[in-house]
Amino acid sequence: MNLHASQAEIDTLEGVVRRAPPGEGVVAAKVALAWHLRQRDSARTLKLVQEVMPVVRASRASTHGDAIASCHARAALAAAEASALYGEVVEAERCLLDARAHLDATWDPQAEGDTWLVEALVARTRGQAERALAALRQAARCFQQAGEGERLEIARAWTLFETMTQQPDAALSDEPATAGPGDSGMAHDAIRCAARALALACRNPAAAARAFTQAGELAQARGLVLLEVSCLLGAGAAIHDLGDYDRAARCFDAAARRARVTGWPTLQVTCDMYFGSLLCDLGAFDESRRTLEDVVEALSARPRGTLLACAHAALARTLLATRRACESAAQMDAAMALFRAADGARDLALNLILQARVLGASAQPARAIEALAEAQALVEARGFDSMRVRLCHAQADLHHRFTLPPPGGMTQPTAALHFAEAALAHGRRLTGWSARAALHDFLAERWAEQGDHQRAYAYARQALAAKEKETAQKMSYPLALLRVRRRAEMRGGPEHAIAPSSHASSRHHDGLPGSVAR
C-alpha cells in the first residue's frame, strides 16, 4: 500500500467501497481508503476504521493470517495518525501499540516502517523531539532493509525536516530534491522543500517564503494537509518578518480556512496565534491580547512544548507594546523556560532578543545584557542573518535607556546610534526587507540629540513614509478581515478553543481504538 495517494487513486477506492459486495474486497478497500484519508479527512478515517474493525477482529479470531485479519495493523495505524491530529495523544499511543501487536509482514510488508513514521508524528504532537527523530531513523532503516526505495526517500526527507525544525543551521545541500516516480515524487519533494524553507527562514525570509509556498503546493497535491497548513503559516511568518502585513494576512487567512476544515483543534489554535501576533503589529492591541490569552489558555491544556512557548512570547510582545512590562516579563519567563527545555537554537535566539527588550522596559539592564550576549553568540555561531536586525535594534534601545559600556570598534557618536545604524545596514542586505517606522524614528531622534539635523531630517522623512504605509495597512483589508473572521468563528461552527471534536467524542463512546505535527 502506498504511503500517500493522489486524488484520482482515492476516487478509485471510493468507487470500490460503493460498489463492492460485502467481503474481503470491500474491507481491504475501506482500510486503504481510511489510510489515505487520514489527513485529507480524519473524521472519515475514524468512521471507516470503526466500520471495519469488528469484521477484522472476527476474522482474526477465526482464521489467523488471512487477508482481512492482516488489515488490523493498517487500520490501527490510520486511527493512530488521525487521533494524533485531533490532539488525542493517549488514544494515538494506544492505537500505535495495537498496530505493532498485529504487524503481518506477509500481507503488509511496509507496515512496520510506516508504524515508525506514525510514531514520529505522535512524538511531535507530544513535543518529544528526540523520540520523533529516533523513530524517523528507525523507519529509514526498516525501508532500507526491505528495499522500499520510495518510502526510504520519504523517511529521509522527514528526518531532514525534523532536524531543520530543531537545528535550522544544520548543513543542507543546495541541490534540489530529485523527483522520484510514483509515491515518493511530490511527497518527498514537498518535505525537502519545507526543510529548505526552515533553514532559509533564519537567513533569507524572502527566499524562505517562496520555498514554503512551493512546498505547500506540493504537499496539497499529495494529501499532506498538516505540512500544507504549516507551510502556509511559515510563508506568512516570513512575509510578516519582512513587514508586508497584507500578504502575511492572506497567508494566515488561507491557513486558517484550511485548518478549520480539518477539525484539528491544535492546528486551528496555532493559526490564531499567528493572527494574534499580526494584530499586534496592526495596532489592534486589545484584540491581539485577548486572542493570545485564549491561545495560551487553550495550549496549556495540551502537552507543553515549543508551541505554548511561542504563544507566551507572542503575548509578551503584545503586553510590551501596551507598556505592561511586568506582565510581559512574566510571560517571557514562562516562554523561556519552555524554549530552553526544547533546546532549539533558532527559537531560543529569537526569544532571547525579545526577552532583552522586555527586561529593558522593566528596568533590569543586567539581565537584558546577559540575554543579548547569549543571543548574539547564537546568531553569530549559527549564521542567523535575519535576526541581526532585531538584535542590533534591541542593543540600540538598551544603550539608549541605560548608561552602559560602549561596544568595541564603535564608529558612531553613541552606542545607541552604532547599533541602530547597524540594524538598518543588516536589514538592507535582506531581500524584500523594509525598515519599520520605529527604527527610522529612533535614528532621527538620536541624530537630532547629536546636533546632526541633516541626518535627523532624512530619517524623519523616511519614518513618515513608513508610517504612511503602515497606517494604510492598518486601515485596509487585513485588520477588517481578521476581525470579521475571528468573530464569525467564535459565533458558529465547531468550538473555537481546543476541545474534543464531535467525531472524537463519538468514537470514544463506540470504544474505537483511536490517535499533530509541530
Language-model features, listed with the residues they occupy:
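Solenoidal tandem-repeat scaffolds enriched in leucines and small polar residues
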Residues: 131-199, 203-210, 214-230, 264
